[in-house]
Swiss-Prot record:
Catalytic reaction(s) noted: tRNA(Ala) + L-alanine + ATP = L-alanyl-tRNA(Ala) + AMP + diphosphate
Main location group: cytoplasm
Essential cofactor(s): Zn(2+)
Protein name: Alanine--tRNA ligase
Keyword annotations from UniProtKB, A to Z: Aminoacyl-tRNA synthetase, ATP-binding, Cytoplasm, Ligase, Metal-binding, Nucleotide-binding, Protein biosynthesis, RNA-binding, tRNA-binding, Zinc
Lineage top rank: taxon: Bacteria
Domain notes: Consists of three domains; the N-terminal catalytic domain, the editing domain and the C-terminal C-Ala domain. The editing domain removes incorrectly charged amino acids, while the C-Ala domain, along with tRNA(Ala), serves as a bridge to cooperatively bring together the editing and aminoacylation centers thus stimulating deacylation of misacylated tRNAs.
GO CC aspect terms: cytosol
EC number(s) given by UniProt: 6.1.1.7
HAMAP family for this protein: Ala_tRNA_synth_B
Subcellular location: Cytoplasm
Cofactor note: Binds 1 zinc ion per subunit.
């Protein structure tokens, strides 16, 4: 058999089937497009469902692909086995109603055994078939020439996922030889059994039946072929290595981790698990981010976060205690570049996302692990189970994935009370749902509304005033003929200029009435049957149904809403231009006073980025772009480059808001006629709403001017406060005052040092001999963490051969610092001293072997912590 690189196997596979008349289907993104049934693309056939179910017709009925895929149903096994992966490539050839069993089997045999392709030894190949698949048996036995002893009948060789296409399958196995086990049926040492000797390299599925609702099977009119060959597994066979992780797909990653950890792979089993976890997970994370996913607290983003945190946790067994996963991205990109160039193209962005996420997790990991260790100790002393409420707190407060808690607990033979955990999760979801609903004042989805079928036409795109008829009236949840002054009512108009809250845009306000009554409209939502449902308070007169009324939208508020909505589109485009195409809308609120825009991005924007975005939006406003709005088929809209919001559902006909060339979006909202009407755009804040999501709030027009006016007034007050007359003098004056403050602070520090020195007396008298070490462990009086470091420097200069441990009460906080002479760090480490000491004062810390720092929130425990650390050194 040929020894081939993984990239060579992939290319040979594609070339072989192209020669056999197959069309190459490019690998689709891991994030499914137009398929809500999948979290990730998880197989080679997943992207071809459009052909198998008849929605689309391929250019050729024969298809070949190499599809990247993610499966996360057994993450806990990754690292502990030879071939479990979360990210993998599936090579596949498919026939949509064209060839069937005969050709599929002959193609597979030729590719595997021909010297032009894989060159496998025929005598090392075995196959399994379904017991009743006599046709497959005949082809293997009579046509291929495989002797009966190498054709194994297995009942499980039938591909069936319930209702829909199904059929028998045949699997091809490669015999790796006696070194991987002696033949023994009692130990499943046979093709199809659980063993390391006979490896499945290819699965051919013959989709020839339809699984009916009544659990009967009928022949399909068009029979299909669906095959799958795992590239990682085939590479391990071709390269003659024991596991997939020793192939050229993983070893360059593992080699880099060896350098970082200063440890070798295949020396220590515990370390090997960590190497494999890291190598697997970084591939998944890099590819998923390249395809548009970002770490988050739910959905596919949560999967990424879980994988990254699992890898970080395992890296600690290799003594890697700092962010490093991001450094592996370039290696992944280089390995995969021949077929997947997008990872290299987006490498800088991927690294920034991963590094940001690593840093965030490292901040809470030590504290989370300390809490988990306490929970484990508590469980061991009671019922060997972690309380679900405690596990939820660990997840909710410290960002600890519940799966990580379960995994670490299982290693100690401790279970987690998942029923209580899920109950806590449900309560959290309920609270979130109720919070959302409480912000929506009109949630009356009663039978009354469902039974109202009166048509209502929205005319608000064309006008803000309209003469119409009040057709339906609701009071206290009931349809009524009339209502009285002061009552809050819901009503429907035959035609309405009032926009109903939708797409982030708030509803219009205004009045509805005639000479006999007036209703102040306070809210408008969509009724179950599509009408605009108005809410309002009767100002005067008796309201009766079927009355002719004047419906008038508050024009000033409407104009401000239009400005903010159009500015939101410009903001979205500017963010993509400045930050990158990964930016997608994650939510918005368009009001008359302001706009709020949530978007996907891995970290806080810099001030320069904020300034660039603000400038670009204003430039497009000042250009005076005509805003063209038209309805068209959705395919036509996409062809012209219209941006569809991720996760939104659109009909066949869509409304396109065109501010070309800068912004083209699908949108049902109300906009200005020309961007110049917006006047001015000013960002007032940029913040985070959750991992991977940022929020910008901004003003336009008059609100932006008033905001700038307020800033100017505050600046004038500062000018008066620092007693200067010119605007240009303010900065220099503040610098002068800061310099004076700095000098005064230095004088204060010097006085504090002198006081501390007087109180401490001769530090030689404070030093103790403990277990062969000279140790100074004491509390010092300082005013901040900087001063405790300066005090440490003073003590070190006088006692260079002593271990020095200082603690200070800073009010509600504790500051800790420790140093160890470098020549003693092979016996005791400063980082270990602080890690053991900090929890006693309610905190955490760490650092280098020769110097470490920490802190806490329980100054009353300082004396106890100092006594503890002396005992700790005594026991070394």
């Amino acid at each position: 058999m040929k020894n081939l690189k993984a990239s060579e196997i992939r290319q040979k596979y594609i070339d072989f089937f192209v020669e056999k008349g197959h069309m190459v289907e490019p690998s689709a993104p891991l994030v499914p497009i137009d398929d809500d049934s999948l979290l990730w693309i998880n197989s080679g056939v997943a992207t071809l469902k459009k052909y198998f179910d008849g929605r689309e017709t391929p250019r050729k009925p024969r298809i070949v692909n190499s599809q990247k895929a993610i499966r996360t149903n057994d993450i806990e096994n990754v690292g502990f086995t030879a071939r479990h992966h979360t990210f993998f490539e599936m090579l596949g050839n498919f026939s949509i109603g064209d060839y069937f069993k005969k050709e599929a089997i002959h193609f597979a045999w030729e590719f595997l055994t021909s010297e032009n392709w894989m060159g496998m030894e025929p005598e090392k190949l075995y196959v399994t078939i379904h017991p009743e698949d006599s046709e497959a048996y005949r082809i293997w036995n009579d046509e291929i020439g495989l002797e009966e002893s190498r054709i194994i009948r297995i009942e499980g060789n039938f591909w069936d996922i319930g209702e829909g296409p199904s059929g028998p399958n045949t699997e091809i196995f490669y015999d790796r030889g006696d070194e991987y086990g002696q033949d023994d049926p009692s130990e499943e040492m046979y093709p199809g059994g659980e063993n390391e000797r006979y490896l499945e390299v290819w699965n051919l599925v013959f989709s020839e039946f339809n699984h009916n609702k009544d659990n009967t099977y009928t022949p399909l009119p068009n029979k299909n072929i669906d095959t799958g060959m795992g590239l990682e597994r085939m590479a391990s066979v071709s390269q003659n290595v024991r596991t997939n992780y020793e192939t050229d797909l993983f070893m360059p990653i593992i080699n880099e981790v060896e350098k970082v950890a200063d440890k070798k792979y295949l020396v220590n089993n515990e370390h090997d698990i960590a190497f494999k976890v890291i190598a697997d997970h970084i591939r998944t994370i890099a590819f998923a981010i390249a395809d548009g996913a970002l770490p988050a607290n739910e959905g596919r983003g949560y999967v990424l976060r879980r994988l990254l945190r699992r890898a970080v946790r395992f890296s600690q067994t290799l003594d890697i205690n700092e962010p490093f996963m991001y450094k592996l991205v370039d290696i992944v990109a280089e390995i995969m570049e021949p077929y997947y160039p997008n990872v290299k193209e987006k490498a800088d962005f991927i690294k920034r996302v991963i590094k940001s996420e690593e840093e965030r997790f490292h901040e809470t990991l030590q504290e989370g692990l300390a809490i988990l260790n306490n929970l484990l100790a508590k469980a061991k002393s009671s019922n060997n189970e972690i309380n679900g409420s405690d596990a939820f707190k660990l997840y909710d407060t410290y960002g600890f994935p519940i799966e990580l808690t379960e995994e670490l607990a299982s290693q100690e033979n401790i279970s987690v009370d998942m029923a209580t955990f899920e109950k806590e999760m449900d309560q959290q979801r309920t609270r979130a749902r109720e919070a959302r609903q409480s912000s929506q004042s009109m949630q009356i989805q009663s039978e009354v509304l469902k039974n109202i079928t009166t048509e209502s036409k929205f005319v608000g795109y064309e006008t803000t005033d309209y003469q119409t008829t009040l057709t339906d009236l609701i009071y206290n949840g009931e349809k009524v003929e009339s209502a009285e002054p002061g009552e809050t009512v819901y009503f429907i108009l035959k035609e309405t200029p009032f926009y109903a809250v939708s797409g982030g845009q708030v509803a219009d306000k205004g009045t509805v009435g005639n000479e006999n009554f007036e209703i102040e409209v306070t809210e408008v939502t969509k009724a179950p049957n599509g009408q605009n449902l108005h809410q309002g308070v009767i100002q005067f007169g008796q309201v009766t149904i079927n009355s002719d009324v004047d419906a008038s939208v508050n024009r000033d508020e409407r104009k401000d809403i239009q400005k903010n909505h159009s500015a939101t589109h410009l903001l979205h485009a500017a963010l993509k231009e400045v930050l990158g195409e990964h930016v997608n809308q994650a939510g918005s609120l368009v009001e008359s006073e302001r706009l709020r825009f949530d978007f996907s991005h891995f970290g806080p924007m810099t001030q320069d980025e904020i300034d660039q975005v603000e400038r670009r939006v204003n430039e497009e406003i000042w250009r005076g772009i005509s805003v063209n709005i038209q309805e068209m088929p959705i395919n036509e809209a996409k062809q012209m480059g219209a941006m569809a919001l991720f996760g939104e559902k659109y009909g066949d006909i869509v409304r396109v808001v065109n501010m070309a060339p800068f912004s083209i979006e699908l949108c049902g909202g109300i906009h200005v006629d020309n961007t110049a009407e917006i006047g001015l755009f000013k960002i007032i804040s940029e913040s985070g709403t959750g991992a991977g999501v940022r929020r910008i709030e901004a003003f336009t027009g008059k609100s932006a001017f008033l905001h700038l006016e307020d800033i100017q007034n505050k600046f004038n007050s500062i000018k008066d406060q620092v007693k200067v007359k010119s605007d240009n003098q303010v900065f220099d004056k503040i610098v002068q005052l800061q310099e004076e403050e700095k000098n005064l602070h230095k004088q204060l520090e010097q006085r504090n040092k002198e006081i501390t020195s007087l109180k401490m007396g001769n530090i030689e008298d404070q030093i103790e001999e403990i277990n062969g070490f000279k140790v100074l462990a004491t509390e010092v009086e300082v005013s901040n963490a900087k001063e405790i470091r300066q005090t440490m420097d003073d003590f070190k200069s006088k006692q260079q051969d002593a271990i020095i441990i200082l603690a200070s009460d800073l009010g509600e906080k504790v500051s800790l610092i420790a140093t160890v002479p470098k020549e003693q760090t092979d016996k005791i480490k400063a980082g270990d001293i602080i890690k053991n000491m900090a929890p006693l004062v309610g905190g955490k810390g760490g650092g280098r072997p020769d110097m470490a720092q920490g802190g806490g929130t329980q100054p009353e425990n300082i004396s106890e912590a100092l006594r503890f650390i002396k005992d700790y050194i005594k026991k070394l």
